[in-house]
């Protein structure tokens, strides 16, 4: 199993087109216009990003946007065990709808789960054709997707993904600040190509609760794109006007004081200048998670993006980075006076 594409539902197609092409480095490889609306298909590396805006109040996109702010309204996967998943969906009485892949024209299925986010599955296809014009700013693949969900739905959702998609829990942790908190599980497919995280709030003041309130229900909090050089990619993105979350004061000094980091292999000045988070997985300074998070795209408590570099095949997620992200979002909420 692996990611196929993300589908972003927006109010203003032209504005989104300019943002993701000029700032994020995606190339529009096709455009589909129907009586339902307009859909642009964008590629960078092996990433497919669909962007749709509605031309009809009766379209799927319009229905989503009447309930939620702009965001990821569909996540699609390629699956090898197509018939098995189809049978399980039928047994669970989940209503599915036939769908045609917007680029390959392969037949697939789509169905709704938490927060009006469509889940779509297609047969496994060959890798996307690439050339230098599709390199963009160096984003290569979809690394992981994060779903925020209410606490009373969390266990059901986790068990569903494990039962139907065959994912397993790789990590779980709780993050707390003096004013907020969350619980998170990191799920992954057997081949490791799909990583899908679930977050739920642990109290009413949690920023996950803020997201659920602003999104009017469960939804995709953020998506991470992989890169082989996060410093180069982030430098390009900043030059193009992409804004990222501010890192808490003292973060880098605290990391430099940690005895397990291999100082010689890290360009601390560049990391601090670009505000990139880092987490060591094996206490050698080699298997590093390097991450950075954009500011929310549609106001506080909505979708944002992540850039991630996994050095020496670093796996999973660093709780230290997760804590720093959580504190950075909380600081932003306070600055904007979000209750």
From Swiss-Prot:
GO biological process: tyrosine catabolic process
Key words of the record: Iron, Metal-binding, Repeat
Domain VOC: 2-127, 141-276
Source superkingdom: Bacteria
Residues annotated as signal peptide: none
CC cofactor note: Binds 1 Fe cation per subunit.
Keyword field contains Iron: yes
InterPro entries, per database record: 4OHPhenylPyrv_dOase (IPR005956), 4OHPhenylPyrv_dOase_C (IPR041735), Glyas_Bleomycin-R_OHBP_Dase (IPR029068), Glyas_Fos-R_dOase_dom (IPR004360), VOC (IPR037523)
Keyword Repeat in record: yes
Chain residues that bind Fe cation: 144, 222, 306
GO molecular function, a single term: 4-hydroxyphenylpyruvate dioxygenase activity
Cofactor(s), names only, from the UniProt record: Fe cation
NCBIfam families: 4HPPD (TIGR01263)
Family membership: Belongs to the 4HPPD family.
PANTHER family, per database record: 4-HYDROXYPHENYLPYRUVATE DIOXYGENASE
Protein name: Uncharacterized protein slr0090
